[in-house]
């Protein structure tokens, strides 16, 4: 059987071969894992006479691992005896038990690392299952294996395995980074307590002695691995072991000496980091750091040629710094002063690492630097809170304008450190001389910069003036550089200007005015902003990163432009339309982003653009040609992003055209739309339509709508010539829609008409009617919800237009038939298990109810009740959804529809919601509705009482208040007739006590709607208990 298992495992892991055979092998392996005897076969295979393949042995241990949790005591003892006998023989000793037979194992040193680790992992799992009651001599038995004639720990095979097992035990029960179930965590805590009581002293002694012995065994092949694993064990177990058992002078000296060993110094450094991070009282932690003399040791290790080691030393320095800062935060002033003095000695080292050219090393010290700034800021705020506000003066914005300077609340030492941090951070924010710009905002350096910017913000919030004094000169000097200067210096200045801007927006820098004067930060920024606009270094720098920052900053602060600085405004506009902006051919990212930013900028400064609008329109026009070739060369997401960015230019073109005089505007619209018409005509001529032609039609139609949206903001009435061109657009859309029956084209058509309606109004009712007929015939189930939303939007836009009302009357019956048919098909599919159709069904139900509600709100309910058969179908459907709380949102929407119907039709004829309003066909009789209004009351009680209804759920509570709304509106329409119905007929049926019934009808009569809904909720809660 063992041979079959080995063969199956070897076949299963092969990357080649017959897939069917591999699947059979996998199935066989899974059967072995699941079987009750599988672990025994695998134990025999692993520890048997014959050396199996590594894959088979690894699989055997996996099967044993999974089985351990379900084995009884006798079986666990069996596994222990055989595995430990195997370990003894692998360590070069006899198997130790006459009744246990295992094969002649080879040295563990011959195994690959992954096999050693797997054996250690399995023994750790076995420890967890047996240490409490079965194998309490676990550690003692392993330590006996370590002995050799030369030394108590001189068996390298056993020492290597022993340390791997200890590392795995810590990982399973002591590693706090792993989130575990409460039951598992409780078991782990119990195991740790047992270890502390039984074995911890001996364990700690063994680690130290192993470390001391093997660090000098230069000729032993396993020596380095054993030393490094011993350091890992000490670093891991120290978090939950008694520190005095580990931090003995002899052991610490050995660890310190290993800092100079190229093969072990990284592990030694990590070990010290864990020792420093051990939780203990602040006083004890301070004494530990002092006794270890770590600050001096760190200084001797700094700036190594070994990059990875340098990073670990930085991590250690960060650990020490963070611990010292925590002590300063929590201890008394006298004690924390001594601690802060030690911390200040470390800061030159922390800042040196902060400025390291390797970002991974630099990142290591950011937490401690950030913690120090938080400490200073907290203490500064505490001191500021002591200021008596009665002695201060407030400005018109209710802000204190003569508050003492930030510098007043910071000691000289701390002020100097904050300044040195700020300077180091700014230097680190600069791209290195051999580093290129990262276009990806998620790039490593960009992420690091964001963290550094957060540190700058903290510096700013600590001392505004310090920040301005240090940052502003860097910005000004960069903006004053010649265009031929290193782009990295210019880019740094721009980055810092953006940081200054964001610090003002976030409140890190105060913008409080003093009298009529702007704040120092505002004044400084405004000066630097206009220096940037006028800077040749920025305008002529060839680096796209600089161009992008420039455009981002001017868009955020476009409000600084006015009629008094149009020359600077024109300079910015010129920049945007140059090859550095929207015409950029060097960077696709910058070009697409510039299209978005140019749109935002012009929209903001539209009143100041004036005469240059025509030049801007002409500059944009070449970029309005829609291409689809790139869609096949890149993924759909990037192609879609390019088109979405281009749409900004279409809307911007509309905005700019609206500024022009009538003749120029008409000409501008024609020059924009005519190429689109031509492109659509060409695309719909492709037979049969292909993916490219469909995409081209879609994009061009959406472009029409987006361009129209830009013109929609015009305060003046558009010329007749422009209106006719857009009317032509509506006709083009319908032609394209008729010729290409595709989802994307239908979606684009809805978009275009949504944008044309505000411009053309009722003049395109004929085209809208044609559009709706085509969409109704062709839209799929998936489009139906969007189609209903589109119709609802149209109704609202033309809510006062009788022509649209008449169109709705002719449309509503076939539309509802289509909705009901789709829902019936989807229900059948959903019942058969199609989850997608189940979701789609719910979406259509909700869209349908929203559409009905829109009809009622827009006073067009006459379209529903004109046809009694249609009215009955709609009312029944609404009652059905309102009676089914399995989907709370749908149920609530239906309940709202019923409330509206009762409000408008409750007296048996079409009425307005108030005396100030009117409805179409007001006064029209509604046969039968008045008689069924009282019956609506029943669902108000049936829904909360239905099975599974949770009255404590937030959405359910909202639904119940809507049901109360129905009750109130029935009463408002039916008065005493409804009260009599409740008291004499309905309440007796459902068992409401007489006194409760009387109280209910009294509250229904007297309470306002808002108060009654609260009462109704409480009443229902009591009723369904």
From Swiss-Prot:
GO molecular function: small GTPase binding; tRNA binding
Compartment(s) of residence: Nucleus; Cytoplasm
Keyword Lyase recorded: no
Biological-process GO terms, alphabetical: tRNA processing; tRNA re-export from nucleus
UniProt keywords, alphabetically: Cytoplasm, Nucleus, RNA-binding, Transport, tRNA processing, tRNA-binding
Annotated Gene Ontology cellular component terms: cytoplasm; nuclear matrix; nuclear pore
Domain of life: Eukaryota
Pfam families attached to this UniProt entry: Exportin-T, Xpo1
InterPro entries: ARM-like, ARM-type_fold, Exportin-1/Importin-b-like, Exportin-T_C, XPOT
Family stated for the protein in its record: Belongs to the exportin family.
Summary of the function given for this chain in its UniProt record: tRNA nucleus export receptor which facilitates tRNA translocation across the nuclear pore complex. Involved in pre-tRNA splicing, probably by affecting the interaction of pre-tRNA with splicing endonuclease.
Protein name, per record: Exportin-T
Organism: Yarrowia lipolytica (strain CLIB 122 / E 150)
């Amino acid at each position: 059987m063992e041979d079959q298992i080995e063969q199956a495992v070897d076949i299963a892991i092969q990357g080649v071969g017959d897939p069917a055979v591999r699947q059979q092998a996998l199935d066989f392996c899974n059967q072995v894992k699941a079987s009750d005897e599988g672990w025994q076969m695998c134990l025999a295979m692993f520890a048997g006479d014959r050396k199996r393949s590594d894959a088979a042995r690894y699989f055997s241990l996996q099967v044993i691992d999974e089985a351990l949790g379900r084995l009884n005591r006798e079986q666990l003892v069996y596994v222990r005896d055989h595995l430990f006998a195997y370990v003894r023989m692998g360590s070069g000793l006899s198997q130790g038990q006459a009744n246990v037979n295992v094969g002649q194992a080879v040295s563990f040193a011959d195994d690959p690392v992954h096999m050693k680790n797997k054996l250690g992992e399995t023994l750790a799992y076995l420890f967890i299952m047996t240490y409490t009651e079965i194998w309490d001599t676990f550690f003692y038995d392993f330590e006996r294996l370590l002995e050799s004639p030369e030394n108590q720990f001189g068996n390298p095979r056993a020492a290597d395995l022993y340390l791997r097992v200890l590392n795995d035990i810590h990982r399973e029960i002591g590693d706090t980074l792993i989130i575990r179930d409460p039951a598992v965590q409780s078991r782990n805590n119990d195991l740790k307590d047992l270890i502390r009581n039984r074995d911890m002293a001996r364990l700690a002694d063994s680690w130290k002695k192993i470390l001391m012995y093997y660090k000098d065994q230069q000729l032993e092949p396993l020596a380095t691995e054993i030393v490094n694993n011993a350091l890992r064990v000490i670093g891991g177990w120290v978090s939950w072991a008694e520190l005095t058992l580990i931090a003995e002078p002899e052991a610490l000296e050995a660890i310190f000496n290993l800092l100079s060993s190229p093969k072990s110094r990284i592990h030694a450094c990590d070990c010290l980091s864990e020792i420093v991070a051990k939780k203990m009282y602040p006083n004890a932690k301070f004494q530990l750091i002092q006794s270890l003399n770590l600050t001096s040791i760190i200084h001797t290790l700094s700036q190594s040629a070994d990059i990875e080691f340098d990073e670990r030393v930085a991590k250690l320095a960060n650990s020490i710094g963070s611990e010292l800062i925590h002590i300063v935060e929590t201890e008394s002033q006298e004690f924390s002063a001594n601690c802060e003095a030690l911390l200040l000695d470390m800061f030159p080292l922390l800042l040196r690492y902060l400025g390291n050219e390797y970002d991974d090393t630099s990142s290591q010290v950011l937490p401690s630097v950030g913690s120090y700034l938080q400490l200073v800021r907290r203490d500064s705020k505490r001191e500021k809170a002591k200021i008596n506000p009665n002695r201060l003066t407030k400005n018109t914005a209710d802000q204190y304008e003569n508050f003492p300077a930030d510098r007043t609340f910071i000691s000289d030492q701390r002020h100097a450190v904050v300044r040195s941090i700020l300077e180091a951070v700014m230097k680190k924010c600069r791209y290195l001389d051999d580093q290129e710009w990262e276009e990806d905002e998620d790039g490593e350096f960009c992420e690091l910069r964001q963290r550094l910017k957060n540190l700058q913000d903290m510096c700013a919030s600590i001392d505004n003036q310090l920040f301005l004094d240090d940052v502003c000169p860097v910005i000004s000097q960069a903006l004053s550089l010649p265009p031929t200067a290193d782009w990295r210096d210019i880019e740094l200045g721009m980055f810092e200007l953006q940081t200054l801007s964001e610090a003002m927006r976030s409140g890190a820098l105060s913008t409080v005015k003093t009298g009529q004067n702007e704040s120092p930060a505002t004044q400084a920024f405004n000066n630097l902003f206009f220096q940037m606009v006028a800077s040749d270094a920025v305008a002529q720098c060839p680096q796209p990163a600089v161009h992008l920052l420039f455009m981002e900053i001017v868009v955020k602060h476009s409000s600084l432009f006015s009629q008094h600085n149009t020359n600077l405004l024109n300079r910015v506009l010129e920049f945007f339309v140059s090859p550095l902006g929207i015409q950029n051919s060097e960077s696709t990212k910058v070009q697409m982003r510039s299209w978005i930013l140019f749109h935002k900028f012009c929209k903001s400064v539209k009143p100041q653009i004036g005469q240059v609008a025509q030049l801007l329109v002409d500059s944009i026009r070449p970029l309005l040609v829609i291409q689809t070739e790139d869609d096949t060369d890149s993924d759909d997401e990037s192609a879609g992003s390019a088109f979405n960015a281009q749409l900004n230019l279409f809307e911007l073109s509309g905005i700019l055209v609206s500024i022009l005089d009538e003749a120029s505007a008409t000409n501008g619209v024609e020059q924009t739309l005519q190429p689109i018409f031509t492109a659509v005509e060409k695309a719909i001529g492709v037979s049969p339509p292909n993916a490219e032609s469909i995409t081209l039609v879609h994009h061009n139609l959406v472009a029409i709508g987006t361009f129209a949206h830009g013109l929609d903001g015009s305060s003046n009435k558009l010329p007749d010539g422009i209106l006719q061109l857009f009317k032509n657009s509506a006709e083009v859309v319908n032609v394209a829609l008729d010729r290409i029956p595709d989802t994307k084209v239908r979606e684009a058509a809805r978009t275009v008409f949504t944008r044309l309606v505000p411009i053309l109004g009722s003049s395109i009712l004929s085209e809208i009617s044609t559009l709706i007929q085509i969409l109704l015939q062709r839209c799929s189930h998936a489009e139906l919800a969007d189609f209903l939303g589109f119709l609802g939007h149209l109704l609202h836009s033309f809510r006062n237009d009788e022509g649209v009302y008449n169109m709705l009357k002719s449309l509503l019956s076939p539309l509802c038939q289509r909705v009901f048919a789709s829902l019936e098909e989807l229900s059948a599919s959903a019942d058969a298990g199609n989850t997608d159709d189940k979701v789609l069904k719910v979406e259509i139900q909700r869209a349908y109810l929203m559409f009905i509600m829109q009809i009622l709100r827009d006073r067009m309910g006459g379209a529903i009740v004109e046809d009694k058969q249609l009215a009955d179908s709609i009312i029944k459907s609404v009652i059905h959804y309102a009676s089914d709380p399995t989907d709370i949102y749908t149920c609530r929407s239906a309940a709202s529809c019923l409330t509206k119907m009762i409000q408008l039709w409750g007296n048996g004829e079409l009425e307005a919601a108030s005396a100030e309003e009117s409805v179409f066909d007001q006064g029209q009789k509604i046969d039968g509705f008045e008689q069924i209004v009282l019956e609506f009351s029943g669902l108000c009680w049936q829904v909360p009482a239905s099975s599974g209804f949770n009255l404590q759920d937030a959405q359910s509570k909202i639904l119940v208040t809507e049901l109360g709304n129905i009750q109130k509106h029935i009463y408002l329409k039916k008065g005493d007739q409804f009260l009599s119905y409740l008291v004499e007929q309905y309440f007796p049926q459902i068992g409401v006590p007489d006194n409760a019934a009387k109280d209910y009808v009294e509250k229904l009569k007297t309470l306002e709607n808002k108060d009654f809904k609260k009462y109704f909720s409480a009443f229902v809660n009591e009723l369904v208990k």
